């Protein structure tokens, strides 16, 4: 998918990886970039507008933990203005295994609910045009950081959901792929809580090993968007973009 002249909704587009990705997206010249985020950062929005004045950058406050009906109402407003939306990026995430319910609500349920809400406008069974979903998951969905099992499990769930979305594309007209960053130097990673405090220094320990910058991650994110491969499981790690081949251990045969 060429980003130029497209309409994009980016959930959590002002976070660590999110903001750098938003910068790279506007450089590529979409028609509209609509950012939905809990963070109200007028300075960042102004910066994005200045990077490419031809791009219309809009911000709406949004918490992914709200009910689907509230998300649908917000999307109705956005679709009324834009008429069409080409890409939804679900990027909300927290890393704090002390907050069990909220971790699951933000990292998994929020992704499911936002995607479910946009299907009202995209699903070809309802006369919709289809669309593309890019879900930010994590390499911990492949192999857990066992000291943060709640976070890791929430990302594995988001990855599984995304894989299923891709398989449903012939029915819904909506394609999907996952973005799975490795350890990226963001405020999220510097200090966070392990489950039951099993490892108080887990953030420090991770940063003792090779990492990537948010810019490296963002640049590869844009490459993944442009590749637009339904069902792709993209690993964005150490400045590299790698298509992961998923090993099938079981099949439902339906």
Swiss-Prot record:
Q: Which domain of life is it from?
A: Eukaryota
Q: Name one GO biological process term.
A: alcohol metabolic process
Give the molecular function GO annotations. Answer: alcohol dehydrogenase (NAD+) activity
Q: Return the EC number.
A: 1.1.1.1
CC per GO annotation: cytoplasm
Please name the catalytic residues of this protein. 151 (proton acceptor)
The protein's matches in InterPro entries, at most eight in alphabetical order, are given as: ADH_Drosophila-type (IPR002425), NAD(P)-bd_dom_sf (IPR036291), Sc_DH/Rdtase_CS (IPR020904), SDR_fam (IPR002347)
Note the Pfam families from the entry.
Answer: adh_short
Q: Which residues are recorded as binding substrate?
A: 138
Q: Which UniProt keywords apply?
A: NAD, Oxidoreductase
Name the reaction it catalyses.
Answer: a primary alcohol + NAD(+) = an aldehyde + NADH + H(+); a secondary alcohol + NAD(+) = a ketone + NADH + H(+)
| Positions with a binding annotation for NAD(+) | 10-33
- State the family named in the UniProt similarity comment for this chain: Belongs to the short-chain dehydrogenases/reductases (SDR) family.
Assembly, per entry: Homodimer.
In its UniProt entry, what is this protein called?
Alcohol dehydrogenase
Q: Identify the coding gene.
A: Adh1
């Amino acid at each position: 998918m060429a980003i130029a002249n497209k309409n994009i909704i980016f959930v959590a587009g002002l976070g660590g990886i999110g903001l750098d990705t938003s910068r790279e997206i506007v450089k590529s010249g979409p028609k509209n970039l609509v950012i939905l985020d809990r963070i109200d950062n007028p300075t960042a929005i102004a910066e994005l507008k200045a990077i490419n004045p031809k791009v219309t950058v809009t911000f709406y406050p949004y918490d992914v933990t709200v009910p689907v009906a509230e998300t649908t109402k917000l999307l109705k407003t956005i679709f009324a203005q834009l008429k069409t939306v080409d890409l939804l990026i679900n990027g909300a995430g927290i890393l704090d295994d002390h907050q069990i319910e909220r971790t699951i609500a933000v990292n998994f349920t929020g992704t499911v609910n936002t995607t479910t809400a946009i299907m009202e406008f995209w699903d070809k069974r309802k006369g919709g045009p289809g669309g593309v979903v890019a879900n930010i998951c994590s390499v911990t969905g492949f192999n857990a950081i066992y000291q943060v099992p709640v976070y890791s499990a929430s990302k594995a769930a988001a990855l599984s959901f995304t894989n299923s979305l891709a398989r449903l594309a012939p029915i819904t007209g909506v394609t999907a792929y996952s973005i799975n960053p490795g350890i990226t130097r963001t405020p999220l990673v510097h200090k966070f809580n392990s489950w039951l405090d099993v490892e108080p220094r887990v953030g420090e320990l991770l940063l003792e090993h090779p990492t990537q910058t948010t810019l490296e991650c963002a640049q590869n994110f844009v490459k993944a968007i442009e590749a637009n491969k339904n069902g792709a499981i993209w690993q964005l790690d150490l400045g590299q973009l790698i298509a992961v081949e998923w090993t099938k251990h079981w099949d439902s045969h339906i």
